[in-house]
Amino acid sequence: LSRYQGLIYRKKRVGLLFDLNKMSNELSKAIQQLKKRQTVNGSWPWFEGMPDDRYITQYIVTGFGHLDHLKIKNIRENGEVMEMVQRAIQYLDNRIQEDYEWQLKHNKSKLNNNQLGALQIQYLYARSYFKDVLLAEKNKTAFDYYLKQAEKYWLPNSRYLQGMIALTLNRYDKTAKAVAIMKSLKENSITSEEMGMYWKENYERYFWQEAPIESQALLIEAFDEVANDTKSVDALKVWLLRSKQTQNWQTTKA
């Protein structure tokens, strides 16, 4: 019996090694595709030949941040990848500067009002993975403005964006506010033995910032990193697994 179990174990190990090698090869191919499709200004389009797109560029930068954060790939030790990321971040820093300049020109008397949108929140979150990448002096005022906006106006946003804000603020040492956001998220959640922990808004909607699977996954990250709440993390994972069992996940990111 022990010999048979050992054989099964070794087969599983070989299978795991094959999967890891497959993942590594696929990741290398994806990186080469991204390098090929990155435009001269550092952005990425949705598809080759299309105009640059801010959302997809932030999406890709966040993806690289996740790979590094989860230690799947050390981005900073890969010069080719880090150069792509730095160029993309420079593009995104310039776009946030454009947002701020638009507010100064058209909304100067209302700068203290809520001028925070989903793209600005996504930018702050993507940028928080790469604090070591230089933020040009010319872009610092714009960055600080939107970071303060996120700290002040987090509540009207979707659960997904609230989680992004909590993670961002925590990484920029605004811990008290980040913890307060996590407390609010927990208080507004639903927990059951069968379905785990989730929110009543967890159903498919139109906008990317309301996607339920992506929201749940990001909130797992937030409850782990910001709240250090393993019990909630486990309960959140239950909902995610139940969702996978009962329906097809609707998006590529899911």
PLM region spans:
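Large, well-folded core regions of big proteins
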Residues: 1-254
